[in-house]
Each structure stands twice: as structure tokens, then as C-alpha cells.
Amino acid sequence: DQGGDLVVTLTEGNADLPLILSDYHLIVQPNGGFDKLDAAIGTGPYKLTSYQAGVRATFEKNADDWRDDRGFVDSVELIVMNDTTARIAALSSGQVHFINAVEPKTVRLLERAPIVNVLRSSGKGFCWFLAFCDTGPFDNNDLRLALKYAVDRQAILDRILGGFGTLGNDYPINANYALAPEDIEQRAYDPEKAAEHYKKSGHSGSILLRTSEAAFPGAVDAAVLFQESAKAAGIAIEVKREPDDGYWTNVWNVQPFVASYWGGRPTQD
């Protein structure tokens, strides 16, 4: 309106509106971006100065930021380093100030480093093995159920993720969401049930699972553990480690069965 306030008119009630307004997909553009698609005013503490997809992005302080309690450095540079060893080396040498996606098996080591502070937080994201349900052999529900019962989630959480997380249950809503379901029984590792569904599926031969450390920290080891637990059900999983570089372009959402990661959203809707 004329007073400088943003007015949102809804066609129906939406209790999640305040949270939806905080989603990073929501942007404000002059005339809705119809005049110039890449035009934006921006309300954050930094302005984008350069961007190379899959390489780096640089930012400079926004002198017109409407808040004075943030943006305390003059510039920020985000560098893409898919290789875990390279990220840790960059942090340890002082080349970078922060890294994310630390492998659980290296957390204890980093905690002993005098110049490193390890920060933990619970989140809404999750690690998973995704399959194209419209592509064979994964278009067979019995095969999908066989794989779900053939994965030892607790073993992956304990042995691969170092206990940093909670068990997933084949849907994307965890306890960090306000409306997380509490009445759905946890699906547990059950090689007998897995074998039963696998037999019903009529499938034979190995199943190719593609993975990479780019998917999530420990993704390669998790895939190998999945392979081992599935053997007890008579299911042969072939694990193929893909290069970290190019994984999100060449493998994820391209190949039918892959390791992946999904970030959280403001609400479960």
C-alpha cells in the first residue's frame, strides 16, 4: 500500500503464510519480474557480485540494508568444494572460515583441532536413496517394498552417520516439523519381509545403485552397507561410485536409483 507495507490478499485461509514468506524461493521484483526477469531489489545484508554455477559466488556488503544488526564483514565468497578432504584441508589451513556437510566420521577429529569449532543443529533435511517409480524395475511396488525392508537404517545411522540424525521412515516429514505424524509405525530392517516382497516382484539380477560423497557425507559407505544388508534378503545391489564433480548434473535426477539429499522447507506443505 502507500504506507510502504506489503499487503498479501489470500483467496482462502493459510496458517502457514508467515513461514512461507520466509522461504528462499519467494523473491520481490519490480512488476513481478515481467519487465526484466533477473531484476531484483533485494532485502538482505549482501549483494551478489559474481556467480559461476558449481564453482563460486561472491557478495559485497549492502550499504542500504534495512537492519544494522547483521552483515559485519565487507564481503563473502562461497566456494564449491565437493571433495570432503579438500574442504577439511581448506578449513584446517585457514583458506576458508566455514565448511558444511562434514563427514560424521571426521567430526571427532575436527573437535580436537584447537582452531576449529564444530556446530551441531537439528534440521528438516534428510539423506535418502531415491528411485524413479515410473521406471523399471522400480515401478513394481513389491520391489520397492523389498528395498525398504532390506535397508538397515539403524546400522547406517550408528555406523555411517555416527548417530548424528534420526531414523527416516520413507516420507519427508520429520519431528522438526510442527505437524509431523506420530501414528505411523517405524519401518524396521526385516530381511524376511524383504525376501518375500522381492520374490513377489519377479525381479532377478542385480540392482544398480549410484552414489557419491557429493550426495551426502558418508553416502558411499551407506550404499555399501545397504548392499550388505540386502544380501540377507537375497537382493543383489551393485554399488557404483560416481565422481563428486558433476554428480548433481549427470547422475541425480538422471539415473533411476541414486543416493541423494533433500533440504528442509519452512512447513510440511
Model-found features: residue ranges?
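Gly/Pro-rich hinge or "lid" segments in bacterial periplasmic/extracellular proteins
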Residues: 20-71, 75-77, 83, 196
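Structural transition elements
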Residues: 166-200, 216-219
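Ligand-site clamp/hinge motif
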Residues: 64-109, 228, 236
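Short, hydrophobic alpha-helical packing/hinge segments within bilobed ligand-binding/sensory domains
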Residues: 87-88, 96, 106-107, 143, ...
